[in-house]
Each structure stands twice: as structure tokens, then as C-alpha cells.
UniProtKB/Swiss-Prot annotation:
Ranges for region Amidoligase domain: 1-265
MF terms in GO: ATP binding; CTP synthase activity; glutaminase activity; identical protein binding; metal ion binding
Similarity comment text for this entry: Belongs to the CTP synthase family.
Organism phylogeny: Bacteria, Pseudomonadati, Pseudomonadota, Alphaproteobacteria, Rickettsiales
Family matches, as InterPro entries: Class_I_gatase-like (IPR029062), CTP_synthase (IPR004468), CTP_synthase_N (IPR017456), GATASE (IPR017926), GATase1_CTP_Synthase (IPR033828), P-loop_NTPase (IPR027417)
Active site: 379 (nucleophile), 509, 511
Residue positions binding UTP: 13, 222
GO cellular component: cytoophidium; cytoplasm
Organism whose genome encodes this protein: Rickettsia rickettsii (strain Sheila Smith)
Additional observations: CTPSs have evolved a hybrid strategy for distinguishing between UTP and CTP. The overlapping regions of the product feedback inhibitory and substrate sites recognize a common feature in both compounds, the triphosphate moiety. To differentiate isosteric substrate and product pyrimidine rings, an additional pocket far from the expected kinase/ligase catalytic site, specifically recognizes the cytosine and ribose portions of the product inhibitor.
Protein name: CTP synthase
């Protein structure tokens, strides 16, 4: 029998529902249960694939090519279980299906309404694909009271009535703000949040209270009294210095055991050795390396969430703190770069779309190459690395990417050469995008092959352009090694400059497969090179 857990939020957004869901999933795994985590987003976009990072943050890509919310990255990193397209849905996707079915006559002429037709699609999503799991945790995006979220709350209310309490648990996450003048945590916002949730027919079984400091027993008892929840089911969620401390904090507060007790499941011991090892490594991380991220969205860290975490995973591996130096690529010039990248141990240019800030990124790549600073280029970062090499090392001064320039020598070209730019719209952009996991063959005795310790790998992709293979020979004559190719050898996946300390560009997104207990091999080697560079300088 599958048990369903719904995680909702109130008071404010960005409270950490995703981390709570991911942490609980991991804790249940540690007790031997099989867990699936899903995200339901109330926005009207079909998926976040074409959303501005300022609106949404990172687009997380799954193995099967779904473009999803960054919370799925948390789910994967904490549980080690790969997410898929069946783990994410939006209001836009729901209405798209609904309207398509209506046009096909699948509703047999009845009036199509939010209840029951929209809610039925939501329920079908939640209740489907349950084979082989013991728990399904569903995170509802947004906060209680949001207009766009009402169909989702109604759907899970109906599921709660349908499955009864023995198979359905509601966890509500709220904020206890600390008011300095009063010197106390305020409970009133939590009261109102629970009241709003009850007004739509849902009574939370567990209340998780986020706070920046210790919550006293008196405060917990007061919350219990005013929100009509047993005090043992009021769980404190105190701010942590590192997100990888969150699961153990929840374990210490008994969240996992409270869930099992609610479902009348025997409480079993937890196997948390690898997480305690992570905590110990974090405590032992006294040295640090400085990594510059040459970013287009330098003020929006969530746009590069998986990159940040992958760097931190490598730091955990070596017991090093990663000091990230966010560098605005738009403001980088040949004259300013020495000052802005002073005392840097490694330079990373992440993926992205659009022409803005490309000049600064190319300047940073040149700086890394000519000063022998460890460099890692990801997706667009690799493409710009080939353009920089073409312009400044090989001498192809008019080297360009076809993504932005029609005139010039096209070092980077479309994957689908038959697709005209005029035909590329939001409706068909996915048809021209190489999305999801693809196999890649590595060349023996290269940096990549030595890092992976294998000649066959699978990595996730999200790109429409690739290196123009016509230039492979001239690049090789100048010392560039092409160390990874797609299975059909049409797409260059990895480039290296072996004569430098560490200079690697990859067409894929390795950050999506990194875990805190299993750092990605390329990030491990990049940070290793940065540590060695730091020691030499």
C-alpha cells in the first residue's frame, strides 16, 4: 500500500518546502523504504523551459528530457533517485491536456469545469505511477491562499477524503518570524496560515515551523493549542548553515519517526552513515579555494543552483570550503579582469542562452587560458571556449556562433541545420533542442577518461548548437584534444587543453548528476586542480 505525503507552505514563499520534502524522502529511504518525490507547480507555463531565470531560477533537466523546477534537483541530490517527466506537473500542462481532450470530444459534451475536470487531472497525476514505491511525497508550489494554487489544494483535499487518514498525511510548513523589538518569535502568521488551510478543507497533521533561532517548548505548546495540533507533531525547522545539515536536523527533531507513527508503521533504525560522514567533512573543511563563476545572472544564485551544489560536493570530497566569487560577465573588460579575478584559484563559465554578456565570458576564458588558471566550461561555456581559442590562439578572428551571428566563421553551428531561425518559436523550440541524457564515448588516456575511469558515459544535455566538426583538424594542430563524442560522432562533447594545468569544456551539464555523497568526477578534478593551483600560488 502506497502512503501519500503532501507538503504545503504558508506565510511566505521560499521557506524550504523542497528541502523539507527531499530531506523527509532521504530519511524514509534511510529506514529502508522506497520513496518518490513529485512537484506540482501552479503557474500557467507548461514547463519552465522558456522562463526567464529571474522569474524561475534554474531549469533542471531530467534523464528523460523534462525541463523542471530546481526542487527536483534537491530531490535527486538527497535521495540519489533519478527524477523523470512523471515527477513534475504545472497548471499550464494540465490546461493544455484538458483543452486538447475537450477539442477531441473526450468529455462527451459536458461542461468542462475546474471541479471535477482540472482536479481529476491533478489527482490522476498524483495517484499514477505508484508501482514499486512505499511513499509518494508531493510538494505543492506556492503558498496556501494563492488563487492559482486552489485547484491543487482541492485535489489533495479530495485525495485525503478518498484515501482516509491511514494512507494520507498533510505536512504544512510555516514561518515564525523573529521580531527584534519584542525579542520573540511571532506565532500569529502560523495561526492564520493554518486557518487558511483549514478553510479549504485541509487540516495539517504535522506542522513544520521555520525559524532563525531556537523555538522554546512554551512556543511549541502555544502553537499546538492555537492550531489544534498535538505538540509532538509541531516540528521545529531551525536555519542551518548548510543545506546538507537539514536532513539530520529533521531526524534529530524526529520528523521521520513522527511520519511512521502517524501511519502506524513500525519504527526502524536509520542508516545515516553517509550523511554523518558529510557532516564531519563539512566540520573538517578549514581550507578554502576561490572559484570565480562568470555569470550572466550574477545576482540570482538560483539560476546556477546545480552548479553551486556540484562545486560544494567536490569541496565536501576534499574537505575544502568553496568560496564562490560571483563575477558579472557584462562588466568584465581586458583592463578590469586582473583586479576582478585577483587571487582566484579556478574559473567556471556555466551554461546559458542569449548574446548578452558573451564578450565578458570570452575575456574570462582567455584570462584562464593565458594565465594557466584551472578552467571549466559547461555547455555554452564550452562553446565560447572554442570561439576564444579560434579567435586568439588559432587566429580565426571572425570566429562566431551561429546562435547570434550570420556573418563570420561559424565555429558553433546548429545541430539541426535544416531548421530556420524564423521557424523557431516557443511552440517548437523543444523539437530543435537536444534534451535529456545521451551516451558519450571518451577517448582513452585523456583528462575526461581518467576522471570518469570509463570510456562510456551518459550525461544530460540542453542545447541547440554544437561545435562545427569542419574545424576539428585545425584545432588539434594547435594542441586541443577532442576527448568526448556523441555515439554517432556528430557532436563534440568534451574539449581539453592537456598542456595547461586543467582546461576542460563539456557540451553537457554534469552538475545535474552530482550528489553530496557522490561528487561528479569532473567537478572533483576541477576542484583538485584549483587546490593545487592555490598551493602553488
Amino acid at each position: 500500500m502506497v502512503h501519500f505525503i503532501f507538503v504545503t507552505g504558508g506565510v511566505v514563499s521560499s521557506l524550504g518546502k523542497g528541502l523539507t520534502a527531499a530531506s523527509l524522502a532521504m530519511l524514509l529511504q534511510a529506514k529502508g523504504f522506497r520513496v518518490s518525490v513529485r512537484k506540482l507547480d501552479p503557474y500557467l507555463n507548461i514547463d519552465p523551459g522558456t522562463m526567464n531565470p529571474h522569474e524561475h531560477g534554474e531549469v533542471y533537466v531530467t534523464d528523460d528530457g523534462a525541463e523542471t523546477d530546481l526542487d527536483l534537483g534537491h530531490y535527486e541530490r538527497f535521495t540519489g533517485v533519478s527524477a523523470c517527466k512523471f515527477d513534475s506537473i504545472t497548471t499550464g500542462a494540465i490546461y493544455s491536456k484538458l483543452l486538447k481532450d475537450e477539442r477531441l470530444g473526450n468529455y462527451a459534451g459536458v461542461t468542462v469545469q475546474v471541479i471535477p475536470h482540472v482536479t481529476n487531472i491533478i489527482k490522476d497525476f498524483i495517484l499514477s505511477n505508484t508501482k514499486g514505491v512505499d511513499f509518494i511525497i508531493c510538494e505543492i508550489g506556492g503558498t496556501v491562499g494563492d488563487i492559482e494554487g486552489l485547484p491543487f489544494f482541492e485535489a489533495i483535499r479530495q485525495i485525503g477524503n478518498q484515501l482516509k487518514s491511514e494512507n494520507c498525511l498533510f505536512i504544512h510548513l510555516t514561518l515564525l518570524p523573529y521580531v527584534k523589538t519584542a525579542r520573540e518569535l511571532k506565532i500569529k502568521p502560523t495561526q492564520h496560515s493554518v486557518k487558511a488551510l483549514r478553510a479549504i478543507g485541509i487540516s495539517p497533521n504535522i506542522l513544520v515551523c521555520r525559524a532563525e533561532r531556537h523555538i522554546s517548548k512554551g512556543a511549541i505548546d502555544k502553537i499546538s493549542l492555537l492550531c489544534n495540533i498535538k505538540s509532538e507533531y509541531v516540528v521545529p525547522a531551525i536555519d542551518q548553515k548548510n543545506i546538507y545539515l537539514v536532513p539530520i536536523a529533521y531526524h534529530n527533531s524526529g520528523l521521520d519517526n513522527k511520519v511512521l507513527k502517524f501511519f502506524n508503521i513500525n519504527i526502524m533504525p536509520s542508516k545515516l552513515d553517509k550523511w554523518y560522514d558529510i557532516i564531519n567533512r563539512l566540520k573538517d573543511s578549514n581550507s578554502k579555494v576561490r572559484i570565480a563563476i562568470i555569470a550572466k545572472y550574477h545576482k540570482l544564485k538560483d539560476a546556477y543552483k546545480s552548479v553551486i551544489e556540484a562545486l560544494n560536493h567536490a569541496g565536501i570530497y576534499y574537505k575544502y570550503k568553496i568560496d564562490l566569487v560571483w563575477t558579472n560577465a557584462e562588466n568584465l573588460t581586458e583592463e578590469s579582469i586582473n583586479k576582478k579575478l585577483l587571487d582566484i584559484d579556478g574559473i567556471l563559465v556555466p551554461g546559458g542562452f542569449g548574446e548578452r554578456a558573451t564578450k565578458g565570458k570570452i575575456i574570462a576564458i582567455k584570462y584562464a587560458r593565458t594565465n594557466n588558471i584551472p578552467f571549466f566550461g559547461i555547455c555554452f561555456g564550452m562553446q565560447l571556449a572554442t570561439i576564444e581559442i579560434a579567435q586568439n590562439l588559432i587566429g580565426i578572428k571572425d570566429a562566431v556562433t551561429e546562435e547570434f551571428k550570420v556573418d563570420g566563421t561559424k565555429i558553433i553551428e546548429k545541430i539541426n541545420k535544416n531548421c530556420e531561425d524564423s521557424k523557431i518559436t516557443i511552440e517548437n523550440v523543444k523539437k530543435t533542442m537536444r534534451l535529456g541524457s545521451y551516451p558519450c564515448s571518451l577517448v582513452a588516456n585523456t583528462i575526461a577518461a581518467n576522471a570518469y575511469k570509463s570510456l562510456e558515459i551518459n550525461e544530460r544535455h540542453r542545447h541547440r548548437y554544437k561545435f562545427n566538426n569542419e574545424f576539428q583538424n585545425i584545432f588539434e594542430k594547435h594542441g586541443i584534444v577532442f576527448s568526448g563524442f556523441s555515439k554517432d560522432e556528430e557532436i563534440v562533447e568534451i574539449i581539453e587543453l592537456p598542456l595547461l594545468r586543467w582546461f576542460v569544456g563539456v557540451q553537457f551539464h554534469p552538475e545535474f548528476k552530482s550528489k553530496p555523497f557522490e561528487a561528479h568526477p569532473l567537478f572533483i578534478q576541477f576542484i583538485k586542480a584549483a587546490i593545487e593551483y592555490n598551493k602553488c600560488n
